[in-house]
Amino acid sequence: MIKFLSALILLLVTTAAQAERIRDLTSVQGVRQNSLIGYGLVVGLDGTGDQTTQTPFTTQTLNNMLSQLGITVPTGTNMQLKNVAAVMVTASLPPFGRQGQTIDVVVSSMGNAKSLRGGTLLMTPLKGVDSQVYALAQGNILVGGAGASAGGSSVQVNQLNGGRITNGAVIERELPSQFGVGNTLNLQLNDEDFSMAQQIADTINRVRGYGSATALDARTIQVRVPSGNSSQVRFLADIQNMHVNVTPQDAKVVINSRTGSVVMNREVTLDSCAVAQGNLSVTVNRQANVSQPDTPFGGGQTVVTPQTQIDLRQSGGSLQSVRSSASLNNVVRALNALGATPMDLMSILQSMQSAGCLRAKLEII
């Protein structure tokens, strides 16, 4: 019986205090990706490229490329091309990226091309913010969208003016790294939290000895490491696999004003309150009335007059009681009981916070 109670208590403690690895909560300062950008041409399009009369930069780029290949285009030539498109190419240079390694690239049309499906990106240099070329991109573009048009009607699924080339760029220049230099490294928390920063520092000190780690602020933990790349790699591997108990997060509600979505974490609670929500709808109907003369040869004229009707309706909302809720499930039930739409729920949550009934931070993105 005692063994059973001990196992039950251990299970409850483990469930209440969830342990996570340090590597899932932090990142090493300075070990990050770097953005690359380039300008290039896509060829081989099936008549869906730029209208060169409206995008002169496409023609200029093509002339420059042909001249580099030893082909001279006569001055004043007006090339009417439909299978070429000017594009912007973006990629991310990974940390510790080595020469010869391949990375993915994203290709996006910058002209009036209708689709990049079936196109091939010609060799495009990718530069960093220092204007140095770090990679070269080239390859066939994979477009996730689809579309068709005929007789003035068209249908489209997803985007056709952007695509991706898997392993489409080769790294030609390595980015200098400061890893392995010095005897300290900084771990950065994904979300600032004073208690979590101190808890990670205490965990490292218990395993590696007092003074091995110091919490500098709510996001940064400074760690003393041995000198040399190989020693620091082994040291960081051991630290990142350590487990810490995750403290409860701040109660937060995130509202996306563009899509109307509402997301909240499990720490959100409600106090008792009363809510009344009314709906206001405006309906506009417009019809065209056609008036024709009675006699076909009487010299009359057909007249089209628009007729507009506006209807304004307001539905009153009854006052409803919202009970105090201490768990996420109860919060969801209480809000669903109001019968409000997501857009109405955004206003209700803002009013609840102003009234002091919503125990959470409200973030609108």
Swiss-Prot record:
Any Gene Ontology CC annotation: outer membrane-bounded periplasmic space
One GO MF term: structural molecule activity
Subcellular location: Periplasm; Bacterial flagellum basal body
Pfam family, one: FlgI
Primary role: Assembles around the rod to form the L-ring and probably protects the motor/basal body from shearing forces during rotation.
Alphabetic keyword roster: Bacterial flagellum, Periplasm, Signal
Self-association state and partner proteins as the record states: The basal body constitutes a major portion of the flagellar organelle and consists of four rings (L,P,S, and M) mounted on a central rod.
Similarity comment text for this entry: Belongs to the FlgI family.
Protein name, UniProt field: Flagellar P-ring protein
Superkingdom of origin organism: Bacteria
Signal peptide stretch: 1-19
Main location, first listed in the record: periplasm
